[in-house]
Amino acid sequence: MKLLGIVILYYPDDAVVKNIATYLAQLDELMLWDNTPATDRRDLDLDSLEDGRGKIILDGCGENLGIGSALNKAVAYARANGFTHLLTLDQDSCFGGRNFESYLRAIRS
């Protein structure tokens, strides 16, 4: 299984990075699609995500085109890069304890 995650961001705060840390190690790659208008964007401190080096793709177009547009971009990227599964997440999504590992076992079985 090759797993791409996508998180759709809209005015993200620092909690997003903590949420990402709960599942990033289990993903092959993670696309962060920012729907925040370009004039309001701020950089997230992704350097603290040790499991993210080379795994995080930052994207967006500087305007809010909605969830569908971001998901379409993720699907196109997944197909072009040999991913077998796509995990869609909201910026508030997080996993506690070993919940994500249990989730992956369920998908594989």
Named regions from a protein language model:
Residues 2-4:
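Cell-envelope/extracellular polymer assembly enzymes that use nucleotide-activated donors
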Residues 109:
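A short, conserved acidic/glycine-rich loop-to-beta-strand motif
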Residues 61-78:
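Glycine-rich, basic loop-to-helix element that forms the pyrophosphate-binding segment
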Residues 83-92:
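Short beta-strand-to-loop acidic/aromatic patch adjacent to the donor-nucleotide binding site
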Residues 93-106:
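Acidic donor-binding/catalytic loop of UDP-sugar-dependent glycosyltransferases
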Residues 16-17, 39-48, 98:
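Acidic helix N-cap motif at the loop->helix transition within catalytic regions
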Residues 34-45, 63, 93-94:
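A conserved acidic beta->alpha catalytic loop
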Residues 9-26:
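Short, well-formed alpha-helical segments that are part of the catalytic scaffolds
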